[in-house]
UniProtKB/Swiss-Prot annotation:
Source lineage: Eukaryota, Metazoa, Ecdysozoa, Arthropoda, Hexapoda
Source organism (scientific name): Drosophila melanogaster
An MF annotation (GO) of this entry: structural constituent of ribosome
Superkingdom assignment: Eukaryota
Family membership noted in the UniProt record: Belongs to the universal ribosomal protein uS9 family.
Keywords: Ribonucleoprotein, Ribosomal protein
One cellular component (GO) term of this entry: cytosolic small ribosomal subunit
Protein name (Swiss-Prot/TrEMBL): Small ribosomal subunit protein uS9
GO biological process, alphabetically ordered: cytoplasmic translation; maturation of SSU-rRNA from tricistronic rRNA transcript (SSU-rRNA, 5.8S rRNA, LSU-rRNA)
Length: 148
């Protein structure tokens, strides 16, 4: 009885973050499938945010995405923060996949194109919400002071 050997799946798992939104992208060999929370990119509303998500695809061209399937899970944050987290996760996943399974030259080419267009596609934005302090309604604003 001969056992079939299954070759390991070529896949990478990468996350993208913006404020409190976290997107986890799972990228494996495939045929150009791109889904966010189980839905295709075309179903994302409003259209303005959909265009933001398509930036990595438009920059690199469809042929770079043709050989991979990317599935993204996203949670936390607001609509815009989630979109930025997703586009970062997609970009980082593609770079990581090309580094691990394709070749270093094409990975560097992809990385250079993305960084030249918008650095936040690969590098996280460190800005966070400042905590509120006592003596005022917000982080910096103070309550009004009266002298008489």
């Amino acid at each position: 009885m001969q056992q079939k050997r299954r070759e390991p799946v070529q896949a990478v798992q990468v996350f993208g973050r913006k404020k409190t939104a976290t997107a986890v992208a799972y990228c494996k060999r495939g045929n150009g499938l791109l889904k966010v929370n189980g839905r295709p990119l075309e179903q994302i509303e409003p259209k303005v945010l959909q265009y933001k998500l398509q930036e990595p695809l438009l920059l690199l061209g469809k042929e770079k995405f043709a050989g991979v399937d990317i599935r993204v899970r996203v949670s936390g944050g607001g609509h815009v923060a989630q979109i930025y987290a997703i586009r970062q996760a997609i970009s980082k996943a593609l770079v990581a996949f090309y580094q691990k399974y394709v070749d270093e030259a094409s990975k560097k080419e992809i990385k250079d194109i993305l960084v030249q267009y918008d650095r936040t596609l690969l590098v996280g934005d460190p800005r966070r919400c400042e905590p509120k302090k006592f003596g005022g309604p917000g982080a910096r604003a103070r309550y009004q002071k009266s002298y008489r």
